[in-house]
């Protein structure tokens, strides 16, 4: 019995005047989603806590039943997705070439991503940057556009990922000083490591600015009235840690179908298979051929449409996705789940927002409720009101894999009914 989770990134939204005070999902014509809702069980899901906006990576981590304490941080997930070798005495951050202007207050970020810059220019800029500061080794791995993975290593392990971002993320803000975050440190030793790591990174970033500001590539770009790339903005410091694989935790062979290398990194971290797809349509067409217990199909299109801050763009994407979902060929005993990881408002200033998201379950074991349409408002009248941490338990339940609570099967506690070859059997 397969569980198929279709994840429409950032699907949840807010009402807007341009859509007659409806959300894009309410306004869109979605006959296929509505049919599934009418014949399934619906509700709302809060991925973490009401009102707290989440990023894609941590939202998925929670939806797959892992805790925030187990989450290593996005930097190392991104590094895994880029096939970068992961070392024990290193931390990993996302770094981006941006444009800043220095004034008496600090470095005002004009653009977090330098526009119209070639790969050749980027390589020449990066080749001029320092690789060592105060005993810490800095190494940049190109990712895409103006983005990199920054690996920082200290040979004796005197390093910590419990440090803050320099990238302010929001518009019209200044570069932030990297600081040790005391509340994340479990000991004074860890806090000391974090302070030294932050100090070295701040020194590195200032050195990088001095080099880039006067680099001949940027001097030439200024003459051509092009935006210079004069600062390296960092965020998402993280360090590798081992957690239970998805198979160990849930007893299901799993695959992720997605376009982004971020999901490749998540798959590698959790021991899931990864199939890179070029489109949501390709994923829909591929599902009938797959014999995994758990199939996760992700599309970023809904989220990207919301980021344009034009609700009509999101309506168009939702209607396109609905048509493709109508082509999905399910097996008789498949369990289908459709939901989002978070809400992405197509109006207002927020990047992501903290509202709950609609969710539907469709399959032979599901209790059908009275919901007739799939959207944020209709689903609020459905049977379900769940948190993200409960999703996988419901999937085990509706695929008849849930172990009776209190039973102890094998050498560790499980949520799922194990197969004989997964536990030691007593022999006479």
Curated annotation (Swiss-Prot):
Source organism, top-level taxon: Archaea
Pathway connected to this protein: Carbohydrate degradation; glycolysis; pyruvate from D-glyceraldehyde 3-phosphate: step 3/5
EC supergroup of this enzyme: isomerase
InterPro entries assigned: Alkaline_phosphatase_core_sf, ApgAM_prokaryotes, Metalloenzyme, Pglycerate_mutase_ApgM, Pglycerate_mutase_ApgM_sf
Keywords assigned: Glycolysis, Isomerase
Catalytic activity: (2R)-2-phosphoglycerate = (2R)-3-phosphoglycerate
Biological process annotations from GO: glycolytic process
rRNA-binding among keywords: no
EC number: 5.4.2.12
UniProt GO MF annotations: metal ion binding; phosphoglycerate mutase activity
Stored Gene3D superfamilies: Alkaline Phosphatase, subunit A, Metalloenzyme domain
Family under the similarity heading: Belongs to the BPG-independent phosphoglycerate mutase family. A-PGAM subfamily.
Protein name in the entry: 2,3-bisphosphoglycerate-independent phosphoglycerate mutase 2
Taxonomic source organism: Methanocaldococcus jannaschii (strain ATCC 43067 / DSM 2661 / JAL-1 / JCM 10045 / NBRC 100440) (Methanococcus jannaschii)
């Amino acid at each position: 019995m397969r569980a198929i989770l279709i994840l429409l990134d950032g699907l949840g939204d807010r009402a807007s005047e341009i859509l007659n005070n409806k959300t894009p999902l309410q306004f869109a014509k979605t006959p296929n989603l509505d049919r599934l809702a009418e014949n399934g069980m619906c509700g709302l899901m809060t991925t973490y806590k009401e009102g707290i906006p989440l990023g894609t990576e941590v939202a998925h981590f929670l939806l797959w039943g892992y805790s925030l304490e187990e989450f290593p941080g996005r930097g190392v997930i991104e590094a895994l997705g880029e096939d970068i070798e992961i070392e024990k005495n290193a931390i990993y951050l996302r770094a981006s070439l941006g444009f800043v202007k220095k004034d008496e207050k600090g470095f005002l970020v004009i653009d977090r991503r330098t526009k119209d810059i070639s790969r050749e220019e980027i390589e020449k800029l990066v080749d001029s940057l320092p690789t060592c500061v105060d005993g810490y080794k800095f190494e940049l791995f190109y990712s895409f556009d103006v983005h990199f993975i920054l690996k920082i290593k200290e040979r004796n392990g005197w390093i910590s990922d419990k440090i803050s971002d320099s990238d302010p993320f929001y518009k019209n803000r200044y570069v932030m000083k990297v600081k040790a975050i005391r509340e994340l440190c479990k000991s004074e030793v860890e806090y000391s490591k974090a302070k030294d790591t932050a100090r070295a990174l701040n020194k590195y970033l200032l050195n990088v600015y001095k080099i880039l500001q006067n680099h001949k590539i940027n001097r030439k770009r200024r003459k051509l009235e092009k935006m210079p790339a004069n600062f390296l903005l960092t965020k998402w410091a993280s360090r590798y840690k081992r957690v239970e694989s998805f198979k160990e935790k849930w007893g299901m062979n799993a695959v992720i179908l997605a376009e982004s290398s971020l999901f490749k990194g998540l798959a590698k971290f959790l021991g899931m298979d990864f199939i890179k797809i070029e489109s949501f349509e390709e994923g829909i067409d591929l599902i009938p051929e797959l014999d995994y217990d758990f199939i996760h199909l992700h599309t970023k299109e809904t989220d990207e449409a919301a980021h344009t801050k034009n609700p009509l763009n999101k309506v168009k994407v939702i209607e396109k996705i609905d048509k493709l979902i109508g082509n999905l060929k399910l097996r008789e005993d498949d369990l289908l789940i459709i939901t989002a990881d978070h809400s992405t408002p197509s109006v207002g200033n927020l990047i992501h927002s903290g509202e709950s998201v609609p969710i539907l379950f469709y399959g032979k074991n599901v209790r059908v409720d009275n919901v007739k349409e799939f959207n944020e408002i209709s689903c609020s009248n459905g049977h379900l009101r769940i948190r993200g941490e409960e999703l996988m338990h419901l999937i085990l339940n509706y695929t008849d894999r849930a172990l009776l609570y209190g039973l102890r099967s094998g050498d560790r506690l499980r949520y799922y009914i194990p197969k004989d070859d997964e536990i030691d059997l007593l022999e006479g």
